[in-house]
Swiss-Prot record:
Residues annotated for GTP binding in this entry: 29-36, 56-60, 75-78, 142-145, 170-173
Keywords: Cell cycle, Cell division, GTP-binding, Magnesium, Metal-binding, Nucleotide-binding, Septation
Coiled coil: none
Domain of life: Bacteria
PROSITE patterns: G_ENGB
Family per similarity comment: Belongs to the TRAFAC class TrmE-Era-EngA-EngB-Septin-like GTPase superfamily. EngB GTPase family.
Keyword hit for Cytoplasm: no
Binding sites annotated in the UniProt record for Mg(2+): 36, 58
Region (Disordered): 195-216
Signal peptide: none
Gene label: engB
Protein's name in the database: Probable GTP-binding protein EngB
Originating organism: Nitratidesulfovibrio vulgaris (strain DP4) (Desulfovibrio vulgaris)
Pfam families attached to this UniProt entry: MMR_HSR1
UniProt function note: Necessary for normal cell division and for the maintenance of normal septation.
Lineage, broadest ranks: Bacteria, Pseudomonadati, Thermodesulfobacteriota, Desulfovibrionia, Desulfovibrionales
Length: 216
């Protein structure tokens, strides 16, 4: 099945977050992890989501409707961008947490992880938060084309240890690597086909305060 994305609405404040009965999958990741590029790759369009070499550009919650299936991929502000005020980082952290805790139709959290980097603290915090709150988790390595095969495999193994054996998918927006596999996972997640990890002993808390280094 061929799917694409349509930007339906954007929320910049807590009050602008919308209620949708349709299944939603949140897309989260650090600044400059390649979220916008991945959205464009999923949509097979170059400029649906604006991309930039400068981190800190996505400062809103963007609701993309998946056609023809009808579920939503919701692009959250990125985290870990230090070149903005602490007040602004906290604002976007609250926006992310409010979306996650209030979304009754949230089917899962797709966390984007830079294939070039060892597991980062903020990424580990977010995945632990999801597991502690029984949110089905879909880990996705981005920029796989920037890594050699051995490096990709090593990174998958690193994350598998942290995620109870779950290896992340490897993707590359520029080459299309893993995009078809990612679509299959997203459809399954929207249909309730994936389940949260049973073990969450590594989760530090049931709040998302640890990632208040936010904006992407």
């Amino acid at each position: 099945m061929s799917s694409t994305l349509v930007l339906e609405t954007t929320a910049y404040t807590l009050e602008q977050l919308i209620h949708l009965d349709a299944p939603q999958i949140a897309l989260a990741g650090r600044s400059n992890v390649g979220k916008s590029s991945l959205v464009n790759a999923l949509a097979r369009r170059k400029q649906l989501a604006k991309t930039s070499s400068t981190p800190g550009k996505t400062r809103s919650v963007n609701y993309y409707r998946v056609e023809p299936e009808g579920f939503y991929i919701v692009d959250l502000p990125g985290y870990g961008y230090a070149q903005c005020s602490k007040e602004e980082r906290k604002k976007w952290a609250k926006l992310i947490e409010k979306y996650i805790v209030s979304c009754k139709s949230l089917r899962g959290l797709a966390v984007l992880l830079d294939c070039r980097l060892d597991p980062q603290r903020l990424d580990v915090d977010l995945t632990s938060y999801a597991r502690a709150n029984n949110i089905p988790l879909l880990p996705v390595l981005t920029k796989g084309d920037k890594c050699k095969l051995r490096e990709r495999s090593d990174r998958q193994k690193q994350w598998a240890v942290l995620l109870g054996g779950r290896k992340p998918l490897v993707t590359a927006s520029m080459t299309g690597l893993g995009i078809a596999d990612l679509w299959r996972e997203l459809r399954a997640l929207a249909a309730g086909g994936l389940s949260a990890d049973d073990e969450a002993e590594d989760a530090p808390s049931d709040t998302i305060d640890a990632i208040d280094d936010v904006t992407a």
